[in-house]
Amino acid sequence: MVCTGYATVPHALLMTLCKRWHAETNSFHLPVGEMTVTLDDVTCLMHIPIEGRMWSHPKKMSRTDGTDLMVRHLGVQQAEVLKNCNEEYGGYISYKALREYYEGYIDSATRLSDPKNLGDPQKLERVLTAYVKSYFLYLVGCLLIGDKSNKCIELVYLTTMEDGYAGMHNYSWGGMTLAYLYHCLAEASLPGDRALGGSVTLLTVRNCHI
């Protein structure tokens, strides 16, 4: 799943669909009639929950707040986080840096769980927790709520993990994915806009079933 996203979908198809999108009805106006993406499509094609709390963040997260989230949830040293959180863009991290983090956690967990050289079990648990959270954040960016730059993900999504794994299940990830896709399609349908954010994977798969 981490290999999907904006870089792997047919851009010409997406831009053609954007030209057909009408924000007033949240639907595509095609020669054969109207079509849209529904919550039923989300749950059937992506198998993510559509029930639960909706979540939004109207303000862009600052670099300072994003750094605090990285330190608290992913166990990264503050000095290292500041290198990867650009001052200009605030609380964002690149896919490349995030991928390096979770791949590093995999290597650390493998060493700590080696029967021939068992490490501190509490440290192993912290490493595994950081791995799951960083991988989840990567999936959110690649599959569900992608940035139109196709380069980075907002660190604010780490706040959905404040209550642990059980708390993450309380959110309607399907509902948020669809709402954000509608928003991105409305922006991309405007004259002069040539980029599309949101779950382009969902949009592509849905249109393969027309």
How would you describe each model-predicted region?
Residues M1-Y182, G198:
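N-terminal leader regions that mediate targeting or early regulatory function
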Residues H169-M176, A188-T201, N207-I210:
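Compact beta-rich and alpha/beta scaffold cores in large eukaryotic transport/transcription complexes
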